[in-house]
């Protein structure tokens, strides 16, 4: 169990954290009814359940109180300055009361939900008759956006940025919209305390391609995990105390949020034999500095940070010492000492160290102000995952003061910032838990559809996987819906995975080609008599195979196409070249394995087919053009002997390499066993 880092996040080296916007804590029947409707929609495992249609009807009824698009546009154009959504809500509350305010909030959320599901194509139009109009979902999205829904504004801004789904590209307007949403996210401060090595977005398509695949987010939430940690902590396990400390700090997996209990767990982990966990010392320093679970004690914070450094070289501890010095929490402000500590943290790849160092250069504290260099350092903080760095970089690229103005990059940075601030990961993790734990594919499809509307590539790909592979949505148009989604993914992200999946659908005749999208670049080795389906599939394979970063799966599929003559000219040598290129482009063994195996199988297949053809048994499914040099004739005894010898030699080669692989696997297992600690 690895140690935990509570990430110290400071905008300008300040200690205080911004609080989330807090609505009145009174119960609201309107909001509660909306929440029940959403849960009703998510609870079923298939779109065909009667309660799903009922939920759609309720959402449509909730959305019906929203003003028309024309009214909302006139309201916006009639205002001298853009009104913030929170201000509008307060005005409605003051003029009409809390119920009217809540109905406004529910109406815009319902509009966004219905719009996102209609755009995917899984909304029951019989339950929402007005949605039969093909433009309805775009108008609904814009209405929700103009009403101030943050997710709707993100989704509409994303469409303005990329120019798709019937929305004309307008990067300046997209930048303005996403910047406004990002500013709301900034007010929240860091979403929560963070564990080093957060789970990345997970792709369900990898389940079909990697036998060792598992969901990190689900594994981290295993039902018995907390019980195991409690047992280990009772037996004095330092790492278990550290893990339980984190859970108590944030209120995770049934552990009640309790800063005092978190402090005690970290204290136990820090007091064990050998000086305790260095990470626990860092966490104690963080809590002493912020007065979390204990009184503020800057001297004790410095002591714990120093121990974390001496016992484990913990990079964030250097940053913590820098914050103490910068803010003068130990006496006089000392920018020189703060700079030195931030530099030490940055040397150890600490994102907060880089962020604070960048701020020192931008503000000119203890160094000549150099905003351009500060932005360069801020880029590194963003690469390492600092929560606020994308926002600051977005401002820099939008203004063009420290760097050349770049609207597209600024928009992308604000979009990245919004993704983290508005907790897209929670929806994605809940969705994958629906699939793997609860076998609720429909609930997962709903969650992924909402997040994909915001511009999440992984969520969009998972929508496609669920449409193709699950029973969440079983209507006849599910493959066409998947293909439409794949084309949008390709347009927005240039995704090689999406190109391969779309090519597979085209090759198997499950969807019709889009002549303007799928057939715009002819492959020079395309077969003249190939069908439109095969030509379209090949073009997507080629685009993914020969992109800036060649994609192994596309290369191996194109290799098979050349071997079998599917839409391309038959060329055995070209097949082997593509299989080898796929292996070279692979990032891990599960990507490389199909390429290596394809090369071995194709050679053996050609050898066996050649022998079969000589004996007048046919070419074993391979195109005859592979054997154009062979004459159809009966084989003499000597020829039979030669063919038999070739087959035996081929089998011997396979056996030899199989033995090599087994030997290597056995050696790896033995080495791993030797590395395990003895009991």
Annotate each PLM feature.
Residues 46-50, 81-86, 100-104, 119-132, ...:
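Short coil/turn and helix-start
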Residues 58, 62, 111-120, 124, ...:
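Hydrophobic face of amphipathic alpha-helices that form TPR/SEL1-like repeat modules
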Residues 95, 141, 178, 229, ...:
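Hydrophobic/aromatic packing residues within the alpha-helices of TPR/SEL1-like helical repeat arrays
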Residues 108, 150-152, 189, 238-239, ...:
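Helix-start (N-cap) detector for alpha-helical repeat units in TPR-like alpha-solenoids
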Residues 168-186, 383-387, 395, 404-422, ...:
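TPR/TPR-like (Sel1-like) alpha-helical repeat modules
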Residues 188, 201-211, 293, 330, ...:
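Alpha-helical linker/edge segments of TPR/alpha-solenoid repeat scaffolds
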Residues 190-219, 395-398, 426-436, 463-469, ...:
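TPR/TPR-like alpha-solenoid helical repeat scaffolds
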């Amino acid at each position: 169990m690895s140690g935990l880092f509570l990430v110290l996040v400071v905008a300008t080296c300040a200690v205080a954290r911004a609080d989330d916007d807090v609505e009145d804590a009174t119960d609201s029947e309107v909001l509660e009814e909306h929440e029940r409707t959403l849960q009703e929609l998510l609870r079923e495992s298939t779109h065909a359940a009667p309660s799903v249609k009922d939920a759609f009807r309720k959402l449509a009824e909730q959305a019906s109180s929203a003003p028309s698009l024309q009214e909302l546009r006139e309201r916006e154009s009639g205002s001298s300055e853009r009104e913030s959504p929170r201000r509008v809500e307060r005005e409605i509350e003051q003029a009409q009361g809390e119920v009217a305010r809540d109905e406004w909030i529910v109406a815009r959320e319902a509009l966004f939900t219905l719009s996102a599901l209609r755009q995917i194509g899984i909304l029951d139009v019989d339950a929402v008759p007005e949605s039969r109009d093909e433009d309805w979902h775009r108008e609904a999205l814009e209405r929700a956006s103009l009403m101030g829904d943050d997710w709707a504004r993100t989704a509409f801004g994303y469409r303005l940025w990329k120019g798709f789904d019937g929305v004309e590209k307008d990067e300046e307007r997209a930048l303005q919209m996403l910047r406004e949403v990002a500013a709301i996210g900034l007010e929240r401060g860091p979403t929560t305390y963070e564990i080093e090595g957060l789970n990345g977005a997970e792709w369900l398509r990898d389940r079909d391609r990697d036998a060792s695949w598992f969901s990190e987010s689900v594994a981290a939430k295993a039902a018995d995990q907390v019980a195991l940690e409690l047992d280990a902590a009772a037996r004095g396990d330092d790492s278990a105390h550290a893990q339980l400390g984190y859970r108590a700090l944030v209120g995770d997996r049934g552990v009640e949020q309790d800063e005092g209990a978190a402090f005690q767990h970290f204290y136990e982990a820090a007091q064990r034999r050998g000086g305790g966990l260095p990470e626990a010392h860092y966490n104690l320093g963080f809590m002493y500095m912020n007065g979390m679970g204990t009184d503020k004690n800057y001297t004790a914070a410095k002591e714990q940070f120093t121990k974390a450094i001496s016992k484990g070289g913990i990079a964030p501890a250097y940053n913590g010492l820098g914050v103490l010095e910068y803010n003068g929490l130990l006496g006089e402000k000392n920018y020189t000492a703060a700079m030195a500590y931030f530099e030490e943290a940055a040397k150890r790849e600490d994102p907060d160290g880089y962020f604070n160092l960048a701020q020192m250069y931008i503000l000119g504290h203890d160094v000549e102000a150099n905003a351009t260099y500060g932005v360069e350092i801020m880029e590194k903080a963003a690469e390492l995952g600092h929560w606020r760095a994308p926002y600051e970089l977005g401002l820099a690229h939008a203004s063009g003061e420290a760097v050349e103005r770049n609207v597209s990059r600024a928009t992308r940075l604000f979009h990245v910032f919004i993704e983290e601030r508005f907790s897209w990961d929670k929806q994605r993790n809940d969705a994958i838990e629906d699939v793997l734990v609860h076998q609720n594919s429909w609930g997962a499809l709903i969650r992924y559809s909402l997040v994909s509307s915001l511009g999440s590539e992984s969520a969009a790909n998972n929508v496609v996987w669920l449409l193709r592979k699950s029973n969440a949505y079983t209507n006849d148009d599910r493959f066409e819906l998947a293909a439409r989604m794949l084309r949008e993914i390709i347009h927005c992200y240039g995704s090689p995975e999406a190109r391969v999946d779309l090519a597979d659908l085209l090759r198997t005749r499950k969807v019709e080609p889009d002549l303007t999208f799928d057939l715009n670049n002819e492959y020079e080795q395309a077969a003249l008599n190939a069908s439109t389906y095969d030509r379209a599939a090949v073009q997507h394979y080629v685009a993914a195979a020969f992109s800036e970063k060649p994609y192994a799966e596309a290369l191996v599929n194109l290799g098979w196409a050349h071997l079998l003559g599917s839409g391309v000219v038959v060329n055995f040598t070209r097949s082997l070249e593509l299989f080898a290129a796929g292996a070279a482009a692979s990032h891990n063994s599960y990507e490389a394995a199909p390429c290596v195996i394809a090369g071995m199988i194709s050679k053996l297949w050609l050898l066996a087919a050649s022998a079969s053809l000589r004996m007048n048994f046919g070419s074993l499914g391979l195109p005859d053009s592979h054997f154009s040099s062979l004459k159809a004739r009966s084989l003499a005894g000597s020829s039979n002997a030669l063919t038999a010898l070739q087959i035996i030699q081929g089998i011997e080669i396979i056996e030899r390499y199989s033995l090599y692989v087994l030997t290597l696997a056995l050696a790896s297992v033995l080495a791993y066993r030797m590395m395990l600690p003895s009991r």
